[in-house]
From Swiss-Prot:
It catalyses: guanosine(37) in tRNA + S-adenosyl-L-methionine = N(1)-methylguanosine(37) in tRNA + S-adenosyl-L-homocysteine + H(+). This is tRNA (guanine-N(1)-)-methyltransferase. Keywords: Cytoplasm, Methyltransferase, S-adenosyl-L-methionine, Transferase, tRNA processing. GO terms for biological process: tRNA N1-guanine methylation. GO terms for molecular function: tRNA (guanine(37)-N1)-methyltransferase activity. It is an enzyme of class 2 (transferase). Its EC number is 2.1.1.228. It comes from Pseudoalteromonas translucida (strain TAC 125).
């Protein structure tokens, strides 16, 4: 980890060039270029034992598909851990892992050093997981061709929580899920678009009323679209009043 970086990330992948999407573009790209995030990649193919740089092997017991070869993967993990120094958390991106959410991203951001293993083929040897992996994480109940896209998703979610990565300190705080709620609607110019007006309160200049409106919309949108999230929240008195007001206005509008 460099002196200025707030997050050290190491990725083990057979396709390291895929990660150019987050190291060269957007807020994560700027964070890498500015040194807030120290990003590194290790390709198991560089540690292959034969001239063909073989990185896959047959699974014991037969069956379709191949597994990532153990020795190149072990060496890549060892090199990543050596570069990271003490305290690095090794994560395997796996559909069997804990499902990533905002709370999980916040927990991972506090780790400061992350080594992500992006699997390919049918996965990796179970003994590698048992001996070298600290945690398994998933981005959802669906199948992808490899762990690179899940790893990039995790990196992006965690990077947004690193101080200084976003242009405005409140940006991460106002994102969906940051307080357990969905985000409120947002509007920009023009004031009228296809005969639809920007809500008057947003033009009022009354910051207290604007904040109250945004909170009410956030509560209402969560109630409409993700009511399960409300079950995990202990609403304040103000939030309960605003949600009740939103529900009343919504039911009135629906007739």
């Amino acid at each position: 980890m460099t002196q200025t970086s707030s997050l050290w990330v190491g990725v083990i992948s057979l396709f390291p060039d895929m990660f150019d999407a987050i190291t060269d573009q957007g807020v994560t790209g700027r964070a890498v270029k500015s040194g807030l995030i120290d990003f590194n990649c290790w390709n198991p193919r560089d540690y292959a034992l034969d001239k063909h740089r073989t990185v896959d092997d047959r699974p014991y017991g037969g069956g379709p598909g191949m597994l990532m070869m153990v020795e190149p993967l072990k060496k890549a993990i060892a090199e990543a851990k050596k570069a990271a120094g003490d305290g690095a958390k090794v994560i395997y991106m796996s559909p069997q892992g804990r499902k990533l959410d905002q709370q999980g991203a916040s927990e991972l951001a506090s780790s400061k050093k992350l080594i992500l293993i992006a699997g390919r083929y049918e996965g990796i040897d179970e003994r590698i997981i048992e001996s070298y992996v600290d945690e398994e994480w998933s981005i959802g109940d669906f199948i992808l061709s490899g762990g690179e896209l899940p790893a990039m998703t995790l990196i992006d979610a965690v990077a947004r929580l690193v101080p200084g990565v976003l242009g405005h300190n409140q940006s991460a705080e106002q994102d969906s899920f940051s307080d357990g709620l969905l985000d409120c609607p947002h509007y920009t110019r023009p004031e009228t678009l296809d005969d639809k007006q920007v809500p008057a309160v947003l033009l009022s200049g009354n910051h207290q009323e604007i904040a109250k409106w945004r909170l009410m919309q956030s509560l209402g949108r969560t109630w409409l679209r993700r009511p399960d999230l409300l079950h995990n929240l202990a609403l304040t008195e103000e939030q309960a009043v605003l949600l009740a007001k939103f529900q009343q206005e919504y039911q009135k509008a629906c007739g």
